[in-house]
Amino acid sequence: MGQTRIQARTATKHIFVSGGVASSLGKGLTASSLGQLLTARGLRVTMQKLDPYLNVDPGTMNPFQHGEVFVTEDGAETDLDVGHYERFLDRDLSRDANVTTGQIYSSVIAKERRGEYLGDTVQVIPHITDEIKNRILAMRGPDLQGQTPDVVITEIGGTVGDIESQPFLEAARQIRHDVGRDNVFFLHVSLVPYLAPSGELKTKPTQHSVAALRNIGIQPDALILRCDREVPQALKSKIALMCDVEVDACISTPDAPSIYDIPKVLHREGLDAYVVRRLGLPFRDVDWTVWGDLLDRVHSPREEVEVALVGKYVDLPDAYLSVTEALRAGGFASRAKVNIRWVASDECETAAGAAAALRDVDAILIPGGFGIRGIEGKVGAIHFARTRGIPLLGLCLGLQCVVIEAARSIGLTDANSTEFEPDTQHPVISTMADQKQAVAGEADLGGTMRLGAYPAVLEKGSVVARAYGSEQVSERHRHRYEVNNAYRDKIATSGLKFSGTSPDGLLVEFVELPAEVHPFFVATQAHPELKSRPTRPHPLFAALIAAALKYKLAERLPVDIPDDELASAEQGA
Protein backbone atom coordinates (compact mmCIF):
# COMPACT_ATOMS: atom_id res chain seq x y z
CA MET A 1 0.00 0.00 0.00
CA GLY A 2 2.87 2.36 -0.76
CA GLN A 3 4.99 1.41 2.30
CA THR A 4 7.01 -1.66 3.24
CA ARG A 5 5.86 -3.36 6.40
CA ILE A 6 8.43 -4.74 8.79
CA GLN A 7 8.10 -8.53 8.87
CA ALA A 8 11.53 -9.69 10.01
CA ARG A 9 12.15 -10.80 13.57
CA THR A 10 14.45 -8.52 15.58
CA ALA A 11 16.81 -8.77 18.55
CA THR A 12 15.59 -5.42 19.89
CA LYS A 13 12.69 -5.74 22.34
CA HIS A 14 9.72 -3.38 22.53
CA ILE A 15 7.79 -2.44 25.68
CA PHE A 16 4.57 -0.46 25.27
CA VAL A 17 3.13 1.44 28.24
CA SER A 18 -0.57 2.38 28.06
CA GLY A 19 -2.94 3.89 30.59
CA GLY A 20 -6.55 3.37 31.58
CA VAL A 21 -9.39 4.70 33.77
CA ALA A 22 -7.89 8.18 34.26
CA SER A 23 -5.09 10.42 33.08
CA SER A 24 -2.15 11.57 35.21
CA LEU A 25 -1.58 8.14 36.73
CA GLY A 26 2.16 8.35 36.17
CA LYS A 27 2.69 6.43 32.93
CA GLY A 28 5.75 8.52 32.15
CA LEU A 29 7.32 7.97 35.56
CA THR A 30 6.45 4.26 35.44
CA ALA A 31 8.06 3.90 32.02
CA SER A 32 11.09 5.93 33.13
CA SER A 33 11.52 3.86 36.29
CA LEU A 34 11.33 0.60 34.37
CA GLY A 35 13.89 2.00 31.94
CA GLN A 36 16.17 2.88 34.84
CA LEU A 37 15.88 -0.64 36.27
CA LEU A 38 16.69 -2.28 32.94
CA THR A 39 19.62 0.11 32.49
CA ALA A 40 20.86 -0.84 35.96
CA ARG A 41 20.75 -4.46 34.77
CA GLY A 42 23.26 -3.61 32.07
CA LEU A 43 20.83 -3.21 29.16
CA ARG A 44 20.89 -0.40 26.61
CA VAL A 45 17.47 1.30 26.82
CA THR A 46 15.90 4.09 24.80
CA MET A 47 12.46 5.64 25.19
CA GLN A 48 9.75 7.32 23.17
CA LYS A 49 6.46 9.16 23.80
CA LEU A 50 3.50 8.95 21.42
CA ASP A 51 1.23 11.98 21.90
CA PRO A 52 -2.26 11.84 20.35
CA TYR A 53 -2.80 15.59 19.99
CA LEU A 54 -2.94 17.25 16.56
CA ASN A 55 -0.24 19.81 17.31
CA VAL A 56 2.99 19.03 15.50
CA ASP A 57 4.83 19.66 18.78
CA PRO A 58 4.07 21.36 22.12
CA GLY A 59 6.16 24.42 21.24
CA THR A 60 3.20 26.76 20.73
CA MET A 61 1.01 25.34 23.52
CA ASN A 62 0.05 27.34 26.60
CA PRO A 63 2.24 26.19 29.54
CA PHE A 64 -0.86 26.19 31.74
CA GLN A 65 -2.36 23.49 29.51
CA HIS A 66 0.62 21.33 28.71
CA GLY A 67 3.38 22.11 31.19
CA GLU A 68 6.94 22.75 30.13
CA VAL A 69 8.39 22.19 26.69
CA PHE A 70 11.44 19.94 26.89
CA VAL A 71 14.10 20.66 24.25
CA THR A 72 16.38 17.86 23.07
CA GLU A 73 20.04 18.14 22.06
CA ASP A 74 19.09 18.15 18.38
CA GLY A 75 16.56 20.94 18.82
CA ALA A 76 13.15 19.25 19.07
CA GLU A 77 10.42 20.75 21.25
CA THR A 78 8.96 17.74 23.05
CA ASP A 79 6.67 16.57 25.83
CA LEU A 80 7.83 16.98 29.41
CA ASP A 81 7.87 13.19 29.82
CA VAL A 82 10.93 13.13 27.57
CA GLY A 83 12.64 15.06 30.37
CA HIS A 84 11.75 12.27 32.80
CA TYR A 85 13.19 9.75 30.35
CA GLU A 86 16.50 11.60 30.08
CA ARG A 87 16.81 12.12 33.83
CA PHE A 88 16.04 8.51 34.75
CA LEU A 89 18.11 6.94 31.96
CA ASP A 90 20.90 9.54 32.27
CA ARG A 91 21.25 9.83 28.52
CA ASP A 92 20.37 12.25 25.74
CA LEU A 93 17.45 11.42 23.47
CA SER A 94 16.79 12.70 19.97
CA ARG A 95 13.78 14.29 18.29
CA ASP A 96 12.59 10.76 17.47
CA ALA A 97 11.69 10.39 21.15
CA ASN A 98 8.43 12.32 20.69
CA VAL A 99 5.82 11.55 18.03
CA THR A 100 2.53 13.41 17.70
CA THR A 101 -0.60 12.90 15.62
CA GLY A 102 0.21 16.24 13.98
CA GLN A 103 3.59 14.93 12.82
CA ILE A 104 2.08 11.69 11.53
CA TYR A 105 -0.70 13.33 9.53
CA SER A 106 1.64 16.03 8.18
CA SER A 107 4.03 13.36 6.92
CA VAL A 108 1.31 11.19 5.37
CA ILE A 109 -0.35 14.14 3.63
CA ALA A 110 3.02 15.34 2.29
CA LYS A 111 3.71 11.86 0.90
CA GLU A 112 0.28 11.75 -0.70
CA ARG A 113 0.91 15.09 -2.39
CA ARG A 114 4.21 13.78 -3.73
CA GLY A 115 2.43 10.75 -5.16
CA GLU A 116 4.25 8.22 -2.99
CA TYR A 117 1.11 6.13 -2.44
CA LEU A 118 0.74 5.41 -6.17
CA GLY A 119 -2.92 6.37 -6.37
CA ASP A 120 -4.04 4.51 -3.23
CA THR A 121 -6.95 5.78 -1.18
CA VAL A 122 -5.10 7.09 1.88
CA GLN A 123 -6.68 5.77 5.09
CA VAL A 124 -6.01 5.51 8.81
CA ILE A 125 -5.28 1.82 8.28
CA PRO A 126 -2.77 1.13 6.80
CA HIS A 127 -1.24 4.50 5.97
CA ILE A 128 -1.47 6.31 9.31
CA THR A 129 -0.69 3.19 11.33
CA ASP A 130 2.23 2.31 9.06
CA GLU A 131 3.68 5.79 9.55
CA ILE A 132 3.37 5.37 13.32
CA LYS A 133 5.02 1.95 13.13
CA ASN A 134 7.90 3.35 11.11
CA ARG A 135 8.49 6.01 13.79
CA ILE A 136 8.44 3.38 16.55
CA LEU A 137 10.69 0.93 14.70
CA ALA A 138 13.13 3.73 13.84
CA MET A 139 14.05 3.80 17.53
CA ARG A 140 15.85 0.48 17.01
CA GLY A 141 18.57 2.24 15.02
CA PRO A 142 21.74 3.83 16.42
CA ASP A 143 21.06 6.66 18.90
CA LEU A 144 22.86 10.00 19.34
CA GLN A 145 25.78 8.08 20.84
CA GLY A 146 25.88 5.67 17.89
CA GLN A 147 24.71 2.68 19.95
CA THR A 148 21.87 0.28 19.14
CA PRO A 149 19.37 -0.26 21.98
CA ASP A 150 18.47 -3.61 23.51
CA VAL A 151 15.04 -2.32 24.58
CA VAL A 152 12.73 0.40 23.26
CA ILE A 153 10.13 1.60 25.78
CA THR A 154 7.24 3.45 24.12
CA GLU A 155 4.69 5.34 26.19
CA ILE A 156 1.31 5.79 24.50
CA GLY A 157 -0.24 9.06 25.63
CA GLY A 158 -3.87 9.44 26.58
CA THR A 159 -6.21 6.84 28.01
CA VAL A 160 -7.51 3.62 26.48
CA GLY A 161 -10.89 4.45 24.96
CA ASP A 162 -9.89 7.90 23.73
CA ILE A 163 -10.62 8.35 20.02
CA GLU A 164 -7.29 10.11 19.53
CA SER A 165 -5.26 7.17 20.85
CA GLN A 166 -6.79 4.45 18.68
CA PRO A 167 -4.35 4.64 15.72
CA PHE A 168 -1.38 4.46 18.11
CA LEU A 169 -2.78 1.44 19.96
CA GLU A 170 -3.55 -0.27 16.65
CA ALA A 171 0.01 0.39 15.48
CA ALA A 172 1.37 -1.11 18.70
CA ARG A 173 -0.84 -4.17 18.23
CA GLN A 174 0.50 -4.63 14.71
CA ILE A 175 4.11 -4.32 15.85
CA ARG A 176 3.68 -7.37 18.07
CA HIS A 177 2.59 -9.23 14.93
CA ASP A 178 5.39 -7.78 12.79
CA VAL A 179 8.42 -8.29 15.04
CA GLY A 180 7.29 -11.40 16.91
CA ARG A 181 5.27 -11.88 20.06
CA ASP A 182 8.33 -12.84 22.08
CA ASN A 183 9.83 -9.43 21.32
CA VAL A 184 6.97 -7.24 22.59
CA PHE A 185 5.66 -6.59 26.11
CA PHE A 186 2.48 -4.62 26.93
CA LEU A 187 2.38 -2.86 30.29
CA HIS A 188 -0.93 -1.25 31.29
CA VAL A 189 -1.21 1.37 34.05
CA SER A 190 -4.61 1.45 35.74
CA LEU A 191 -6.28 3.01 38.75
CA VAL A 192 -7.50 1.00 41.74
CA PRO A 193 -9.53 3.60 43.67
CA TYR A 194 -10.13 3.48 47.41
CA LEU A 195 -13.67 4.33 48.54
CA ALA A 196 -13.46 5.76 52.03
CA PRO A 197 -17.16 5.30 53.00
CA SER A 198 -17.00 1.54 52.39
CA GLY A 199 -13.30 1.17 53.21
CA GLU A 200 -12.73 -0.82 50.01
CA LEU A 201 -10.39 -0.89 47.05
CA LYS A 202 -12.39 -1.32 43.85
CA THR A 203 -11.13 -3.44 40.95
CA LYS A 204 -13.96 -2.87 38.47
CA PRO A 205 -12.36 0.19 36.81
CA THR A 206 -9.24 -1.84 36.06
CA GLN A 207 -11.29 -4.77 34.77
CA HIS A 208 -13.19 -2.47 32.39
CA SER A 209 -9.99 -0.75 31.28
CA VAL A 210 -8.35 -4.06 30.41
CA ALA A 211 -11.54 -5.19 28.66
CA ALA A 212 -11.38 -2.04 26.49
CA LEU A 213 -7.74 -2.79 25.68
CA ARG A 214 -8.52 -6.40 24.79
CA ASN A 215 -11.40 -5.23 22.64
CA ILE A 216 -8.91 -3.59 20.29
CA GLY A 217 -6.71 -6.66 20.21
CA ILE A 218 -4.15 -6.04 22.95
CA GLN A 219 -3.78 -8.39 25.90
CA PRO A 220 -1.60 -6.73 28.56
CA ASP A 221 1.32 -8.77 29.88
CA ALA A 222 1.47 -6.90 33.19
CA LEU A 223 -0.62 -4.39 35.12
CA ILE A 224 0.56 -1.42 37.17
CA LEU A 225 -2.06 -0.96 39.90
CA ARG A 226 -2.01 2.70 40.97
CA CYS A 227 -3.43 3.40 44.39
CA ASP A 228 -2.80 5.52 47.44
CA ARG A 229 -2.01 2.35 49.42
CA GLU A 230 -0.75 -1.17 48.92
CA VAL A 231 -3.03 -3.48 46.93
CA PRO A 232 -3.41 -6.69 49.00
CA GLN A 233 -2.53 -10.08 47.55
CA ALA A 234 -6.17 -11.20 47.50
CA LEU A 235 -7.12 -8.32 45.22
CA LYS A 236 -4.09 -8.97 43.02
CA SER A 237 -5.31 -12.54 42.58
CA LYS A 238 -8.79 -11.33 41.70
CA ILE A 239 -7.46 -8.84 39.13
CA ALA A 240 -5.15 -11.49 37.67
CA LEU A 241 -8.08 -13.88 37.20
CA MET A 242 -10.47 -11.32 35.72
CA CYS A 243 -7.87 -9.68 33.46
CA ASP A 244 -6.07 -12.86 32.40
CA VAL A 245 -2.60 -11.93 33.58
CA GLU A 246 -0.28 -13.75 35.96
CA VAL A 247 -0.47 -12.82 39.63
CA ASP A 248 3.24 -11.96 39.56
CA ALA A 249 2.44 -9.46 36.80
CA CYS A 250 0.00 -7.48 38.97
CA ILE A 251 2.25 -4.76 40.34
CA SER A 252 1.10 -2.71 43.32
CA THR A 253 2.43 0.85 43.12
CA PRO A 254 1.26 2.99 46.04
CA ASP A 255 2.24 6.64 46.15
CA ALA A 256 5.97 6.97 46.89
CA PRO A 257 7.68 9.63 49.04
CA SER A 258 9.77 10.72 46.03
CA ILE A 259 9.59 10.04 42.31
CA TYR A 260 13.09 8.61 42.63
CA ASP A 261 11.72 5.88 44.91
CA ILE A 262 9.56 4.44 42.11
CA PRO A 263 12.30 2.16 40.67
CA LYS A 264 12.68 0.59 44.12
CA VAL A 265 8.90 0.10 44.35
CA LEU A 266 8.76 -1.63 40.95
CA HIS A 267 11.81 -3.74 41.77
CA ARG A 268 10.35 -4.83 45.10
CA GLU A 269 7.24 -6.00 43.23
CA GLY A 270 9.42 -7.88 40.73
CA LEU A 271 8.40 -6.04 37.56
CA ASP A 272 11.88 -5.77 36.06
CA ALA A 273 12.65 -9.45 36.67
CA TYR A 274 9.30 -10.43 35.14
CA VAL A 275 9.94 -8.30 32.03
CA VAL A 276 13.45 -9.72 31.60
CA ARG A 277 12.12 -13.27 31.87
CA ARG A 278 9.19 -12.75 29.49
CA LEU A 279 11.33 -11.06 26.83
CA GLY A 280 14.20 -13.51 27.12
CA LEU A 281 16.71 -10.80 28.01
CA PRO A 282 20.01 -11.63 29.74
CA PHE A 283 19.47 -11.78 33.49
CA ARG A 284 21.82 -9.66 35.59
CA ASP A 285 21.38 -8.29 39.08
CA VAL A 286 20.41 -4.64 39.45
CA ASP A 287 23.41 -2.44 40.23
CA TRP A 288 22.13 -0.05 42.88
CA THR A 289 25.45 1.77 43.37
CA VAL A 290 24.49 5.04 41.67
CA TRP A 291 20.74 5.05 42.33
CA GLY A 292 21.21 3.93 45.93
CA ASP A 293 23.52 6.88 46.57
CA LEU A 294 20.89 9.17 45.03
CA LEU A 295 18.18 7.83 47.34
CA ASP A 296 20.47 8.33 50.33
CA ARG A 297 20.90 11.98 49.34
CA VAL A 298 17.15 12.35 48.76
CA HIS A 299 16.10 10.95 52.13
CA SER A 300 19.03 11.90 54.38
CA PRO A 301 19.87 15.55 53.73
CA ARG A 302 22.22 17.30 56.13
CA GLU A 303 21.12 20.83 55.31
CA GLU A 304 18.01 22.64 54.09
CA VAL A 305 17.60 25.76 51.97
CA GLU A 306 14.68 27.69 50.53
CA VAL A 307 14.82 28.92 46.94
CA ALA A 308 12.29 31.37 45.50
CA LEU A 309 11.23 30.53 41.96
CA VAL A 310 9.92 33.82 40.56
CA GLY A 311 7.86 32.93 37.52
CA LYS A 312 4.80 33.66 35.42
CA TYR A 313 3.28 30.18 35.43
CA VAL A 314 3.65 29.21 39.09
CA ASP A 315 0.02 28.09 39.33
CA LEU A 316 1.06 24.99 37.35
CA PRO A 317 4.37 23.63 38.71
CA ASP A 318 4.71 21.32 35.69
CA ALA A 319 5.46 24.46 33.64
CA TYR A 320 8.84 24.49 35.43
CA LEU A 321 9.33 20.75 35.90
CA SER A 322 12.94 20.52 34.70
CA VAL A 323 13.84 23.65 36.68
CA THR A 324 12.49 22.28 39.95
CA GLU A 325 14.14 18.89 39.40
CA ALA A 326 17.43 20.63 38.59
CA LEU A 327 17.16 22.67 41.80
CA ARG A 328 16.56 19.52 43.83
CA ALA A 329 19.48 17.81 42.08
CA GLY A 330 21.64 20.82 42.91
CA GLY A 331 20.70 20.18 46.51
CA PHE A 332 21.68 16.52 46.23
CA ALA A 333 25.21 17.65 45.30
CA SER A 334 25.49 19.37 48.71
CA ARG A 335 23.36 16.80 50.54
CA ALA A 336 20.78 19.53 51.07
CA LYS A 337 17.00 19.51 50.81
CA VAL A 338 15.75 22.29 48.55
CA ASN A 339 12.38 23.77 49.45
CA ILE A 340 10.88 25.77 46.60
CA ARG A 341 8.87 28.90 47.30
CA TRP A 342 6.58 29.63 44.37
CA VAL A 343 6.46 33.39 43.83
CA ALA A 344 4.26 34.93 41.13
CA SER A 345 6.45 37.51 39.45
CA ASP A 346 3.67 40.11 39.65
CA GLU A 347 4.21 40.19 43.43
CA CYS A 348 7.70 41.66 43.02
CA GLU A 349 6.90 44.70 40.87
CA THR A 350 7.35 47.07 43.83
CA ALA A 351 10.21 47.21 46.32
CA ALA A 352 7.76 46.45 49.12
CA GLY A 353 6.33 43.47 47.25
CA ALA A 354 9.76 42.06 46.48
CA ALA A 355 10.84 42.45 50.09
CA ALA A 356 7.70 40.75 51.39
CA ALA A 357 8.06 37.81 48.99
CA LEU A 358 11.83 37.34 49.05
CA ARG A 359 13.39 38.79 52.21
CA ASP A 360 13.83 35.42 53.99
CA VAL A 361 14.82 33.11 51.10
CA ASP A 362 18.31 31.71 50.63
CA ALA A 363 18.44 32.01 46.82
CA ILE A 364 16.36 33.25 43.90
CA LEU A 365 15.82 31.66 40.50
CA ILE A 366 14.40 33.53 37.50
CA PRO A 367 13.19 30.99 34.90
CA GLY A 368 12.39 31.43 31.21
CA GLY A 369 9.09 32.52 29.71
CA PHE A 370 7.44 34.61 27.03
CA GLY A 371 5.32 37.76 26.93
CA ILE A 372 5.20 41.01 28.87
CA ARG A 373 3.07 39.89 31.83
CA GLY A 374 5.10 39.73 35.02
CA ILE A 375 8.31 41.10 33.49
CA GLU A 376 8.58 44.10 35.81
CA GLY A 377 8.21 41.70 38.73
CA LYS A 378 11.13 39.62 37.48
CA VAL A 379 13.22 42.79 37.15
CA GLY A 380 12.17 43.77 40.68
CA ALA A 381 13.22 40.39 42.06
CA ILE A 382 16.59 40.68 40.31
CA HIS A 383 17.11 44.15 41.78
CA PHE A 384 16.31 42.81 45.24
CA ALA A 385 18.77 39.91 44.83
CA ARG A 386 21.53 42.17 43.51
CA THR A 387 21.24 44.81 46.21
CA ARG A 388 20.77 42.37 49.10
CA GLY A 389 23.50 39.92 48.10
CA ILE A 390 21.08 37.00 47.67
CA PRO A 391 22.38 34.23 45.35
CA LEU A 392 20.60 34.39 42.00
CA LEU A 393 20.46 32.30 38.84
CA GLY A 394 18.65 33.53 35.72
CA LEU A 395 17.64 31.29 32.83
CA CYS A 396 16.91 32.47 29.27
CA LEU A 397 14.40 35.28 29.87
CA GLY A 398 16.07 35.52 33.28
CA LEU A 399 19.30 36.67 31.61
CA GLN A 400 17.42 39.22 29.54
CA CYS A 401 15.78 40.62 32.67
CA VAL A 402 19.18 40.77 34.42
CA VAL A 403 20.52 42.84 31.51
CA ILE A 404 17.46 45.13 31.60
CA GLU A 405 17.90 45.67 35.35
CA ALA A 406 21.61 46.43 34.92
CA ALA A 407 20.89 48.93 32.15
CA ARG A 408 18.29 50.73 34.24
CA SER A 409 20.70 50.90 37.18
CA ILE A 410 23.09 53.10 35.16
CA GLY A 411 20.50 55.59 34.01
CA LEU A 412 18.88 53.92 31.00
CA THR A 413 15.60 54.04 32.89
CA ASP A 414 13.43 53.00 29.96
CA ALA A 415 15.70 50.15 28.85
CA ASN A 416 13.65 47.18 27.73
CA SER A 417 13.34 44.29 25.29
CA THR A 418 11.77 44.71 21.87
CA GLU A 419 9.62 41.71 22.80
CA PHE A 420 7.82 43.81 25.41
CA GLU A 421 8.25 47.32 24.00
CA PRO A 422 9.04 47.33 20.26
CA ASP A 423 9.63 51.10 20.20
CA THR A 424 11.72 51.37 23.37
CA GLN A 425 14.38 54.07 23.27
CA HIS A 426 16.99 51.66 24.63
CA PRO A 427 16.43 48.14 23.19
CA VAL A 428 19.07 46.37 25.26
CA ILE A 429 17.40 43.09 24.25
CA SER A 430 16.60 42.80 20.55
CA THR A 431 15.15 40.30 18.11
CA MET A 432 17.67 37.89 16.61
CA ALA A 433 18.22 38.60 12.91
CA ASP A 434 16.88 35.24 11.75
CA GLN A 435 13.79 35.57 13.97
CA LYS A 436 12.41 38.87 12.67
CA GLN A 437 10.02 37.30 10.16
CA ALA A 438 8.49 35.01 12.80
CA VAL A 439 8.08 37.90 15.24
CA ALA A 440 6.48 40.02 12.51
CA GLY A 441 3.99 37.25 11.73
CA GLU A 442 5.51 36.59 8.32
CA ALA A 443 6.74 33.07 9.14
CA ASP A 444 5.64 30.12 11.28
CA LEU A 445 6.04 30.45 15.04
CA GLY A 446 6.26 26.71 15.66
CA GLY A 447 9.71 25.13 15.59
CA THR A 448 11.47 28.29 14.38
CA MET A 449 13.26 29.54 17.49
CA ARG A 450 16.97 29.06 18.17
CA LEU A 451 16.62 25.50 19.40
CA GLY A 452 18.92 22.77 20.65
CA ALA A 453 22.52 22.57 21.83
CA TYR A 454 24.98 25.37 21.04
CA PRO A 455 28.57 25.86 22.26
CA ALA A 456 29.80 28.77 24.36
CA VAL A 457 33.21 30.08 25.38
CA LEU A 458 33.61 31.22 29.00
CA GLU A 459 35.96 33.89 30.30
CA LYS A 460 38.92 32.40 32.13
CA GLY A 461 38.58 32.72 35.90
CA SER A 462 34.92 33.78 35.74
CA VAL A 463 32.31 32.53 38.17
CA VAL A 464 30.71 30.37 35.47
CA ALA A 465 34.04 28.94 34.29
CA ARG A 466 34.85 27.92 37.86
CA ALA A 467 31.39 26.40 38.28
CA TYR A 468 31.72 24.34 35.09
CA GLY A 469 35.38 23.55 35.58
CA SER A 470 35.85 24.35 31.91
CA GLU A 471 35.98 27.27 29.49
CA GLN A 472 34.22 25.37 26.69
CA VAL A 473 30.60 24.34 27.33
CA SER A 474 27.48 23.36 25.42
CA GLU A 475 23.91 24.08 26.51
CA ARG A 476 20.43 23.77 25.03
CA HIS A 477 18.53 26.86 23.94
CA ARG A 478 15.01 28.03 23.12
CA HIS A 479 14.74 31.75 22.35
CA ARG A 480 14.16 34.44 19.72
CA TYR A 481 15.77 37.43 21.45
CA GLU A 482 19.37 38.29 22.36
CA VAL A 483 21.45 40.92 24.12
CA ASN A 484 21.86 43.93 21.83
CA ASN A 485 25.62 44.15 21.21
CA ALA A 486 25.38 47.91 20.72
CA TYR A 487 24.78 48.24 24.47
CA ARG A 488 27.36 45.75 25.78
CA ASP A 489 30.07 48.31 26.60
CA LYS A 490 27.57 50.66 28.23
CA ILE A 491 25.99 47.92 30.35
CA ALA A 492 29.43 46.68 31.41
CA THR A 493 29.90 49.97 33.31
CA SER A 494 27.25 48.72 35.76
CA GLY A 495 29.67 46.02 36.87
CA LEU A 496 27.85 43.24 35.03
CA LYS A 497 30.33 41.05 33.16
CA PHE A 498 29.59 39.31 29.88
CA SER A 499 31.47 36.18 30.90
CA GLY A 500 30.38 33.78 28.16
CA THR A 501 29.61 34.18 24.49
CA SER A 502 29.10 32.11 21.37
CA PRO A 503 32.44 31.03 19.82
CA ASP A 504 32.31 33.96 17.38
CA GLY A 505 31.74 36.38 20.25
CA LEU A 506 28.53 37.78 18.76
CA LEU A 507 25.91 36.26 21.06
CA VAL A 508 25.93 36.76 24.82
CA GLU A 509 25.46 33.42 26.57
CA PHE A 510 26.42 34.18 30.20
CA VAL A 511 26.50 37.25 32.43
CA GLU A 512 27.58 37.58 36.06
CA LEU A 513 28.71 39.84 38.85
CA PRO A 514 32.27 39.12 40.01
CA ALA A 515 32.64 36.95 43.12
CA GLU A 516 34.19 39.84 45.06
CA VAL A 517 31.05 41.93 44.45
CA HIS A 518 28.27 39.38 44.97
CA PRO A 519 28.24 35.82 46.40
CA PHE A 520 26.55 34.37 43.29
CA PHE A 521 24.83 36.38 40.59
CA VAL A 522 24.77 34.46 37.30
CA ALA A 523 22.43 34.28 34.32
CA THR A 524 22.52 32.35 31.07
CA GLN A 525 20.66 32.64 27.78
CA ALA A 526 20.50 28.83 27.76
CA HIS A 527 18.30 26.32 29.57
CA PRO A 528 20.84 24.36 31.66
CA GLU A 529 18.01 22.68 33.57
CA LEU A 530 17.43 20.47 30.52
CA LYS A 531 20.81 18.77 30.97
CA SER A 532 20.60 18.25 34.72
CA ARG A 533 20.35 14.70 36.05
CA PRO A 534 19.48 13.60 39.59
CA THR A 535 22.66 11.51 39.62
CA ARG A 536 24.72 14.24 37.85
CA PRO A 537 23.52 17.67 39.01
CA HIS A 538 24.14 20.54 36.63
CA PRO A 539 27.15 22.67 37.69
CA LEU A 540 25.19 25.95 37.72
CA PHE A 541 22.43 24.57 39.93
CA ALA A 542 24.96 22.88 42.21
CA ALA A 543 26.81 26.21 42.49
CA LEU A 544 23.58 28.11 43.22
CA ILE A 545 22.64 25.77 46.08
CA ALA A 546 26.19 25.82 47.46
CA ALA A 547 26.01 29.62 47.47
CA ALA A 548 22.58 29.48 49.11
CA LEU A 549 23.98 27.31 51.91
CA LYS A 550 26.80 29.79 52.51
CA TYR A 551 24.35 32.68 52.43
CA LYS A 552 22.08 30.96 54.93
CA LEU A 553 24.93 30.36 57.34
CA ALA A 554 26.45 33.83 57.00
CA GLU A 555 25.16 37.08 58.43
CA ARG A 556 22.69 38.53 55.96
CA LEU A 557 24.20 41.93 55.40
CA PRO A 558 23.71 44.06 52.26
CA VAL A 559 26.58 43.85 49.79
CA ASP A 560 28.05 46.99 48.23
CA ILE A 561 24.82 48.99 48.26
CA PRO A 562 24.95 52.76 47.80
CA ASP A 563 23.45 54.59 50.78
CA ASP A 564 20.73 56.28 48.72
CA GLU A 565 19.71 52.98 47.10
CA LEU A 566 19.61 51.22 50.49
CA ALA A 567 17.47 53.98 51.99
CA SER A 568 15.09 53.86 49.03
CA ALA A 569 14.71 50.08 49.31
CA GLU A 570 14.10 50.24 53.06
CA GLN A 571 11.48 52.96 52.63
CA GLY A 572 9.72 50.81 50.02
CA ALA A 573 9.78 47.80 52.34
From Swiss-Prot:
Leftover remarks: CTPSs have evolved a hybrid strategy for distinguishing between UTP and CTP. The overlapping regions of the product feedback inhibitory and substrate sites recognize a common feature in both compounds, the triphosphate moiety. To differentiate isosteric substrate and product pyrimidine rings, an additional pocket far from the expected kinase/ligase catalytic site, specifically recognizes the cytosine and ribose portions of the product inhibitor.
One BP term from GO: pyrimidine nucleobase biosynthetic process
The keyword Ligase is assigned to this record: yes
Membrane-spanning residues: none
Family designation: Belongs to the CTP synthase family.
Gene designation per UniProt: pyrG
Keyword tags: ATP-binding, Glutamine amidotransferase, Ligase, Magnesium, Metal-binding, Nucleotide-binding, Pyrimidine biosynthesis
Pathway info: Pyrimidine metabolism; CTP biosynthesis via de novo pathway; CTP from UDP: step 2/2
Residue ranges occupied by any Glutamine amidotransferase type-1 domain in the UniProt entry: 306-554
Residues the record lists as binding CTP: S23, D162, I163, E164, K202, T203, K204, P205, T206, Q207, K238
Subunit annotation: Homotetramer.
Residues annotated as binding ATP: S24, L25, G26, K27, G28, L29, D81
Protein name per the record: CTP synthase
Ranges for region Amidoligase domain: 1-281
EC number: 6.3.4.2
UniProt GO MF annotations: ATP binding; CTP synthase activity; glutaminase activity; identical protein binding; metal ion binding
UniProt xrefs under Gene3D superfamilies: 3.40.50.880, P-loop containing nucleotide triphosphate hydrolases (3.40.50.300)
